[in-house]
Amino acid sequence: MVRAVTEKNQERALELYYDLLTLKEPPMRILFLLAKQYRQLLQVKQFGAAGLAQTEMASKLGVPTFAVRNIVSCARAYSISELEQAVRDFVDAEESVKTGRLEDKLSVELLIIKYSSKKAAG
């Protein structure tokens, strides 16, 4: 599902999200996984701008080099500023749920819709 979001495949992302909910996956866990992926996308984008090789990126992120290749591929669809905004949005969503401003399922669904949209997020 995370990959469907980062690849901007909204229909698939929502379908998989609803499947996860049916399987009783907690929405906050899904939010955590999405936030983690977007943080990695941002870090890889920043590392690339700094001229780091993918092997160095893998070492800094603590993931295998093949995983970095996948992250780099997904990161191409975003600018650094879009990824920074996404990370802020995920933090804000978590805060909204924890303070009771938004229900957890809705909060995650809204983020999936926003970031899997083909038009520019933000």
List each language-model region with its residue ranges.
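Small-residue-rich helix-loop
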Residues: M1-E82, K119-A120
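Short coil/turn segments at secondary-structure boundaries
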Residues: A4, F47-A49, V87-R88, L102-L106
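Acidic-residue sensor for enzyme active/binding pockets
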Residues: E25, E94, E109
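Residues that form generic nucleotide/phosphate-binding pockets
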Residues: K60, C74, D89, L111, ...
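C-terminal capping/gating helix-and-loop segments adjacent to ligand/active sites or protein-protein/ligand interfaces
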Residues: I71-L102
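Short, charged, intrinsically disordered terminal tails
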Residues: R101-G122
